[in-house]
């Protein structure tokens, strides 16, 4: 029977008046095969991240792990009765099922009636529709009369009601009605009455968008939520969904396992729109063999029963077949991949027959455009691949900086004409449920958090470091996806329940910072700043675009507005402020202006953490508010901080002289390495900047100079560093991003005045990824090398293999951006940091003067 669908047993012949004992035997295997172990779950989970060639010879993908019943993410071989059981006692003439297909002014209904008696029954069908909150009757009348069923007969009857003016169901206004369907026999005697709680709403896929009640609808989503941990906790269900609504999140996905009646009904009450996902994540993934027919039949029949169970719930907006089956991308056998496609397509066709009122997502992570490239249009014409495209992405967590998506790249890469594009899994990392540190497997096995915050990722550090950075990337990504993707229909950010401490306990649950970042990012009307670099000098203009995104919950156009901005310190004191006029914005539209925002000219402290605050006002009413962290510094924090008595010689190949001039650093120019090290009076510091090559003689000159006590500073001269110090520097990596650098030794003098999380998003007043480094150096760690700062590529899982293999993979993705080399009596500091931004970024400037 499976794990999630309803089933019924007619026990009439087995029960008798008085006390009855009902015994149910539950078995945990199918066709005599052993239960699937959690190892199979791990195989599925890891294979999501494999390429086609990696999958084609997967020896673990054997039939044994595919001969179990679908059980979602539950990997502990669950067995037993876990959903409510009820005994129904009725008259022989009984309403067996009702399917309500609502419109905006009524509904059509499929009503199934069965006559369990041994003689013919004549009857009428009456429908009463009652407002669940007020008790007011919206409609009440017979809809079908003079009907008859023969002995043991069953039939489905269809009726339509229109011309009503119901309160519509939307996430903002989750209006519910009790639909009471009665069968009445002679003289109006009610033989049976079935009450179904539902609502009036439509949800459609049309012209490449999603429409709720006739207007475009952007899903402001977060998933998953803690159903699977606490499936029978009604208080938690209501509490969590109310927190979601307060956080401006109005949609989710039933990820990991289908929900039960308790949680779906809570979504109906609280106004949470649902993508209802199927029972078998990773079914037929990559090059796994196709399961036996009886297993597939069990899966498909149970899934259709699940759909039938929940299709009257207004919160269920669309159906998603499964999670990340991905055979369409990853099966190395093209013919087998097509056969898998046809199997799922047949299920989609069955879904449409069972529920023609809702869109279908073929698979959570399926993109029509990718299937088109692989299979061709002729094949796709023979299958049904659903309505909705869904791209899973882990930006700034597994791959890519969020700044790569500031110009609508998401829709440019993934939108197919005529199909709504969403993401049901936009992940940015996971705090644990107790302290807020990164979850253990990512922290220790995969090392993803290290890429973001270095050694602050581990349990000895303050968890607020991870919580702060994780909230930043989550909120910023959510905002940019809304700002620049007018062709997209919504994003569900992942994993929503990890944004709370003790998400499983309704008494103790507390939001983490990401909740509040997303509360701002998910405002229906969103005022949002496009910010690249995050560090500025006092008195400088903030180069930004301020957007307004109009997903107003009443679907209206916005009138011209006022944008109030302010720069405030950590105590809320306003340091600068102003007002700009903002034009009208149509519903589902977005516009931007480039305001004249100037930082305060003088700061009370030389370096300050401040916020840019935005308030959007229409006709005196505040529509949206937002805030962004910035670092500001007085120019005097860096200017003239190097002693005039310090003799500095500069070999300049990349205009570093302009930066030193800005910092009022006195220096003498040299035109060659020879001149650099043979100045008549020995220099306190020799700087080489932007030099790409040198001769063997020049290499010797530099090493000799250092050995005798000379001090060198190599700025963005990686080629020279490798040649001069081959025993210490073996190569370099050009980062895919380079916008985050982490400290190796936060107590080093070079970091005086710089916070442990400050080495990121260096500002140059340009609309480009705000690099903090240009390269990472591969260095041999030894007693003569002092590691100061490093960078690690944003990366996905580090799976399998021996410890040595894992270490090798980690080392292949990381290196040093700042190090010091001792040789003889002298030292050399080698930097790939973006210190050329010192005249626009105070952190870059402080690094340079500290060197």
Question: What are these language model-derived features?
Answer:
Residues 1-94, 117, 136, 258-261, ...:
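Accessory beta-strand-rich segments of carbohydrate-active enzymes
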Residues 607-609, 621-689, 716-719, 727-741, ...:
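Aromatic-Pro/Gly-enriched surface loop or interdomain linker
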Residues 692-773:
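A glycine-rich, often tryptophan-bearing local segment used as a flexible ligand/cofactor-contacting loop or short
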Residues 180-245, 265, 630, 639:
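N-terminal carbohydrate-binding accessory modules
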Residues 238-239, 251-509:
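Substrate-binding/catalytic cleft of secreted carbohydrate-active enzymes
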Residues 501, 505-514, 538, 563, ...:
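Extracellular ligand-binding/catalytic regions of CAZymes and related secreted enzymes
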